[in-house]
Amino acid sequence: MRIFSLIVAGLVLLIQLYPAWGTLYRRFLCKKMNGQCEAECFTFEQKIGTCQANFLCCRKRKEH
């Protein structure tokens, strides 16, 4: 019974870590595309309440 609870605890930890892998993968893709990840919404989208995060929305980096 103790082994079962340890397995369940391990699965819960893996489930919580899964979104972190997605974030790392998106950052890798954006770096590969020479851009930076942007998950912020435009001002007008926030006002009308239709803000959706585009996970692969990469824009070119601005050179200063």
From Swiss-Prot:
It is found in: Secreted. The keyword Oxidoreductase does not apply. Expressed in testis and to a lesser extent in epididymis (caput, corpus and cauda). Also weakly expressed in kidneys. Disulfide bonds join 30-57, 37-51, 41-58. The keyword Disulfide bond applies. GO terms for biological process: defense response to bacterium. Residues 1-22 form the signal peptide. InterPro entries: Defensin_beta-like. GO terms for cellular component: extracellular region. Keywords: Antibiotic, Antimicrobial, Defensin, Disulfide bond, Secreted, Signal. Has antibacterial activity. Belongs to the beta-defensin family. This is Beta-defensin 13. The gene is Defb13.
